[in-house]
Amino acid sequence: MANSFATRTFTTLSDLQPNMANLKVIGVVIGKTDVKGFPDRKNIGSERYTFSFTIRDSPAHFVNAASWGNEDYIKSLSDSFRVGDCVIIENPLIQRKEIEREEKFSPATPSNCKLLLSENHSTVKVCSSYEVDTKLLSLIHLPVKESHDYYSLGDIVANGHSLNGRIINVLAAVKSVGEPKYFTTSDRRKGQRCEVRLYDETEFSFAMTCWDNESILLAQSWMPRETVIFVSDVRISFDKFRNCMTATVISKTIITTNPETPEANILLNFIRENKETNVLDDEIESYFKESINLSTIVDVYTVEQLKGKALKNEGKADPSYGILYAYISTLNIDDETTKVVRNRCSTCGYIVNEASNMCTICNKNSLDFKSVFLSFDMLIDLTDHTGTLHSCSLTGSVAEETLGCTVNEFLAMTDEQKTALKWQFLLERSKIYLKFVVSHRARSGLKISVLSCKLADPTEASRNLSGQTRV
């Protein structure tokens, strides 16, 4: 260890045996759970509190530790260190691990032992990084699983339902980190969630949800489009609401930030190269129609309220959803100078180069020709009695459903027919489902995508516009 610790004797984690006493161990914290309270069976009406963490002192050895006690002690101990800190634990109780029961909820470790910390006998000291050998601190960047033992995001999507409920490992780059959202459960317990968007060479966006405070704190330190993570033992499930596969951080999960492995370095080079060329621009993601159950979107906004929400949510990456009763005030589908149909790559959905008619993204590392298809791609303005939202994105199948025609049918129309189609919307109020996210690049401060646009029922529109009570 470092010179500061030269005179101290530490027991290595590989030498731990059940019932050993009067020892000290040192290690870097690689995982940690939230504090939880449970009814105390011995003292009816009171609660006992606990949390656990995982420490590592060498590439091959790491062990779980847990502490039980009263609320003040446990919360104070938990707040004293975080993932990435180096700690010295004195006088822990060494117990034999019940592998089948404990590894169902705790990280799998190579040790057959676990540490139990007692308020009366054990102490935990956080070491300064200046005191600790850099070899010990570097362990935080070493995954607890083999560096090649992971699924790509594309593999997860391709396997689909067959991976539902499975616990696997994932290597991915961080695309965005959402703002933590706080809530209260039906039994009045406080909760929180944070959605992280991941991507890699095979998939441009994949959701991972953090429900515990420790993983949320860790996620807040990640730099979008710069950080790579190796997520060990994350749960994969099918999200019925969004009709896609997602990942969830659980108590077994250990996340390694910026892992120092060959595979991670390859991914890091990929994101650095594509950061410059905007290969994974949000434009691609906005093209694909999100499989959102529209019946779950209930908040009704005016244009003014949407703009106000943009000011309140400045700096937040999470998208919001809502309903707008408005007129389409700009719909340039009969203007020859405005292009509303574009060629897109059938593989990645990106707009292809018009001159070559080839996808510069998919063909960058491949000589195989990628087919293209025609797709609506237009910007519209939406206006109600409070203002106008400019440059809202209306694309793909949503645009086809809105206009009531396919791209090929639209291209076969005369200019007069296109003008008549346009005025069907300019004269009538529509019920519009929107996805909106704060964006400094957008004219209104909001990047807005239309999820559905249909002529509104006059009675329904009047009722909602007069109330505006659902926001």
Swiss-Prot record:
GO molecular function, one term: single-stranded DNA binding
Functional description taken from the UniProt entry: Single-stranded DNA-binding protein required for homologous recombination in meiosis I. Required for double strand breaks (DSBs) repair and crossover formation and promotion of faithful and complete synapsis. Not required for the initial loading of recombinases but required to maintain a proper number of RAD51 and DMC1 foci after the zygotene stage. May act by ensuring the stabilization of recombinases, which is required for successful homology search and meiotic recombination. Displays Single-stranded DNA 3'-5' exonuclease activity in vitro.
InterPro entries, per database record: MEIOB, NA-bd_OB-fold, OB_MEIOB_N, REPA_OB_2
Keywords: Chromosome, Cytoplasm, DNA-binding, Exonuclease, Hydrolase, Meiosis, Nuclease, Nucleus
Main location: cytoplasm
PANTHER family, A to Z: CELL DIVISION CONTROL PROTEIN 24 OB DOMAIN-CONTAINING PROTEIN-RELATED
Record organism: Macaca fascicularis (Crab-eating macaque)
Gene Ontology annotations of biological process type: double-strand break repair via homologous recombination; female meiosis I; fertilization; homologous chromosome pairing at meiosis; male meiotic nuclear division; resolution of meiotic recombination intermediates
Known DNA-binding region: 167-272
Superkingdom, natural source: Eukaryota
EC number of this enzyme: 3.1.-.-
Pfam families, per the entry: OB_MEIOB_N, REPA_OB_2
Subunit details: Component of a multiprotein complex with RPA2 and SPATA22. Interacts with SPATA22. Interacts with the complex BRME1:HSF2BP:BRCA2.
Protein name: Meiosis-specific with OB domain-containing protein
Sequence similarity: Belongs to the MEIOB family.
